[in-house]
């Protein structure tokens, strides 16, 4: 994600910048699922409490990095359109996801799919 954002910024590539927000959304979903799975491991004793702090901190940091990358990409897109209402832009993107956004999100979801726990 960082490479995608840096490349989009350095190359002033809005197509690449538009691919950052779908990845940020997926990272949030994956982090929530990983936190849920971790709680299950804590409850059944397969993971210790101390490990949980480091794991949770790692996931929180990943979400923060994703949010920062999203902010850079959104600023690029907003600057290009001569509008600079980042929160309004993100709200509209998240509620009115176009076909390109959904396709990009689906591609990322396939690429970064978590293992199915029911088969283990």
Cite the ranges covered by each PLM segment.
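Cytosolic, long alpha-helical scaffolding segments
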Residues: 1-120
């Amino acid at each position: 994600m960082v490479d995608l954002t840096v490349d989009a910024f350095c190359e002033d590539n809005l197509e690449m910048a538009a691919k950052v927000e779908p990845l940020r959304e997926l990272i949030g979903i994956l982090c929530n699922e990983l936190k849920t799975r971790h709680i299950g491991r804590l409850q059944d004793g397969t993971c210790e409490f101390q490990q949980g702090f480091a794991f949770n901190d790692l996931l929180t940091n990943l979400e923060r990095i994703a949010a920062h990358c999203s902010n850079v990409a959104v600023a690029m897109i907003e600057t290009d359109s001569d509008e600079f209402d980042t929160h309004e832009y993100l709200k509209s993107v998240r509620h009115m996801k176009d076909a390109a956004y959904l396709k990009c999100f689906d591609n990322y979801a396939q690429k970064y799919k978590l293992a199915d726990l029911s088969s283990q």
